[in-house]
Structures are given as C-alpha cells and as structure tokens.
Amino acid sequence: MKSARKTAASIVTIVVAALSFGCGDPIPVREMSLARMEITRAESVRADKYAPAELGEARKLLLGTHELIKGDELEKAKQGALDSFAKAREAYEKSLPLLARDTMEIAEKSLGEADEANADMLARDEFEKAQAAFKTAGDSFESKKYYEAYQAALEADKLAKSARNSALGKRAVLKEAIAEVDSVIAEAVKLNARTHSPEKLKTAEESNRAAS
C-alpha cells in the first residue's frame, strides 16, 4: 500500500515536470503509466503470493524511474519503465495459472461438502450449476485459458457453497418433519396399528426411513 502511494506520488511529480519542460521533452509518462497498470493487473491475480520476486522487482524499477528523471537521465528512465512493465507482465503470467489452480481446488472442496449435505437432491439446481461451472473451469484450464478457468472456478465455488447452505437448511426442516412422523407412528403402534392396519403402518415406516 505504501509503495503504491509512493509510486502514485512519483508519477504526479513526473507529470508536473513534463508539463513544465514542455511537450517536446521525452519524459516517459506513458511508459510509466503502462507499467503502473501492469503492476496493478499482476496484483489482481495475487502476484504478491505467487510471484513476489517479480512483482517486487517491477515496483522497484518503476520507483527508480523517478530518481532517473530528477537526474535528467530520461532514456534510462524510459528503459526502467519498460523493464518494470516487462517484469510486471512476467509476474502476472506466472501467477495466473497458479491462482486458477488453487481456486479450482477450493471449488472442488466446496462441491464435495455440498454433496455430503445431499445438495444433489435438496438443492439440485444450484448444485448442477456448480458442477457445470467447475467443468468449464477444468476445460478452460486444460486449454490454457487461465483467466476464464479462474472466473469459472470462482463461480463454481460460490454456487457450491450456496447449494450446501440451502441443502443444510432443508435438511433441518426435513429432520423436524421426520421426527413428527416418527411420533405419529409411535402413537399408532400404541393403538394397535400393527394389528388393525399393518400394511399402512409398514408403508409409513418405510417412507420415513427412506426420507431419513
């Protein structure tokens, strides 16, 4: 966060300098802005976790351009900005497939938990959508479309978690209903239902066991 503020302050200073020197001076404002945007792009795919060395170098190079401009070393400043951009792009490309893979693993775990909660029966629509999104993530990853894989995995994880929560809520309601039926069956047994209505009692017991 501090480095981002320093970089922003540096760019503001450089823009002011560019205006004061006039339009003809080759101060690399555009190159520096592109480098800053590429660093932000790398940060968006967790390059701080997956490519910390590359991201750190990109930030360092960009910050260094400020001193170069103050020293009137404009060509070196431009090259520093270009190098910063390249290093940030490297950080992005290194991080994205790793982020996609890890997000797919999280989604797979969420799908497993949804399955354990019987979401395939109690929240079928969301569960099937989660499965479809996870398949899309896998297909995209195999095709090296890592950003699409990452986005699909995020969607699969969200849907799987929602399906699990819906299923758990319905299971609680179902459990209460089963308990009520058990109570009714127990009362019927006391009233000799096994003697008077054995088939009906058997059907009720089997249905309740199936719902359990």
Label every PLM stretch briefly.
Residues 2-4, 21-212:
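Long, charged/polar, soluble alpha-helical segments
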Residues 1-21:
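Sec-dependent bacterial lipoprotein signal peptides
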